[in-house]
Design a protein with these regions (language model features):
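Active-site/ligand-binding neighborhood in enzyme catalytic cores
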Residues: 1-81, 104
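C-terminal lid/capping helical subdomain adjacent to the catalytic/cofactor pocket in oxidative enzymes
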Residues: 258-335
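Short, histidine-centered active-site or binding-site loop motifs used for metal coordination
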Residues: 206-210, 249, 281-284
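General small-molecule cofactor/ligand-binding pocket signal
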Residues: 71-73, 243-246, 278
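Flavin (FAD/FMN) cofactor-binding core of flavoprotein oxidoreductases
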Residues: 224-272, 323
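Mid-domain catalytic core of redox enzymes
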Residues: 50, 74-236, 270, 313-323, ...
Length: 335
């Protein structure tokens, strides 16, 4: 799909608060070492990161849930959501180990893809069902590549182990490769690297569609392409230096802003009318939120349940402020 087809709200969300003025302020703020300067999200250079990666956060969360008496059913797939005549959810059906199970509930908090949620629900109005069925997604593949070093030189004042470049991730604009971005896991957290002094873990990221030629590749086939593109980009000199590889695939990693997305407001209105259903997270709201905002949608949901609030606008409006074209009035109405 051509980028010109993407709904404008996607760009608004991803560069919110960012402008030429904001970039210049940030540059001069660094030069003059201005303290307590406000930094736009897109320009943030430091952030907190779990010692062993994002998964560690959810491991701790899961342990707390179980400590408080909650039950977590893993490796299961929700296939149906049951609604009664009063437009209230009553139960769901899930599959695990080849068997079907039913679970009843008072509140249903869903982070599953909206398309799947509505597709598995009974008695959905035709228009809402059509919109949900038409929502597109982009899938994701990554190849971890372990090498002794990379050729990128650290030209900054930021100190790193073995003086590797300090970036956590780098976007690739070269049309000669399929690679969209790569990560340097050493810089995310040194605790994730077994031999920090002598190796570098690189994560090659590819944006694909489930079932396409890349998605159907074996790890060996995918590794051959990934390593060859690292050589093209000058990250390494030869496939012989590769010590190890590992492939992962993620379905529906990115909710896409094409097709029926421009009718999303109608679908949100329908989902909000189901009193005990709360849609959260990136796929739950079909919104390209980062992990921070995804968690906030859950915080807002819990707040509503505890206070008995039936208005879900606060949940659906997380990270929707339109600040990307303008600066505030007290900054001279610059744009």
């Amino acid at each position: 799909r051509h980028p010109s087809e993407i709904d404008a709200s996607w760009g608004a969300q991803r560069v919110k608060g960012l402008s030429i003025v904001a970039i210049l302020k940030d540059v001069f703020g660094k030069i003059f070492k201005k303290k307590n300067r406000k930094v736009e999200t897109s320009l943030i250079e430091e952030f907190k990161y779990p010692k062993l990666g994002p998964g560690q956060l959810w491991d701790v969360t899961a342990a707390e849930v179980e400590k408080l008496g909650g039950t977590i059913i893993k490796n299961a797939k929700v296939t149906k959501v049951h609604k009664n005549a009063n437009n209230m959810l009553t139960s769901l059906t899930y599959e695990k180990d080849g068997q079907e199970f039913t679970m009843e509930g008072d509140y249903f908090i869903s982070s599953m893809p909206v398309r799947d949620l509505v597709g598995g629900m009974n008695d959905v109005p035709a228009d809402a069902a059509r919109i949900a069925a038409g929502l597109p997604y982009r899938d994701y593949m990554t190849l971890g590549v372990l090498v002794p070093k990379i050729n990128l030189v650290n030209k900054t004042n930021i100190r790193t182990v073995n003086n590797i470049v300090p970036d956590c991730w780098v976007y690739v604009q070269d049309r000669n490769v399929k690679l969209g971005r790569f990560q340097i896991y050493n810089n995310w957290s040194p605790y994730m690297i077994k031999d920090l002094e002598h190796t570098v873990w690189i994560g090659l990221e590819y944006f694909v569609n489930e079932g396409d030629e890349y998605w159907n590749m074996t790890e060996e086939e995918f590794a051959k392409i990934g390593v060859s593109e690292m050589i093209k980009l000058g990250l390494i000199d030869s496939p012989d230096v590769v010590l190890d590889v590992h492939m992962e695939k993620v379905k529906k990693a990115y909710p896409a802003y094409f097709d029926t997305y421009d009718e999303m407001d109608k679908l949100v209105a329908y989902l909000s009318s189901i009193e005990n259903l709360y849609c959260v997270g990136r796929n739950g709201q079909h919104r390209y939120n980062n992990i921070d905002h995804s968690m906030v949608t859950s915080f807002e949901t819990v707040k509503n349940i505890l206070t008995g609030s039936r208005d879900k606008k606060n949940i659906w409006s997380v990270n929707t402020e339109q600040e990307y074209h303008e600066t505030s009035n007290n900054e001279g109405n610059e744009a």
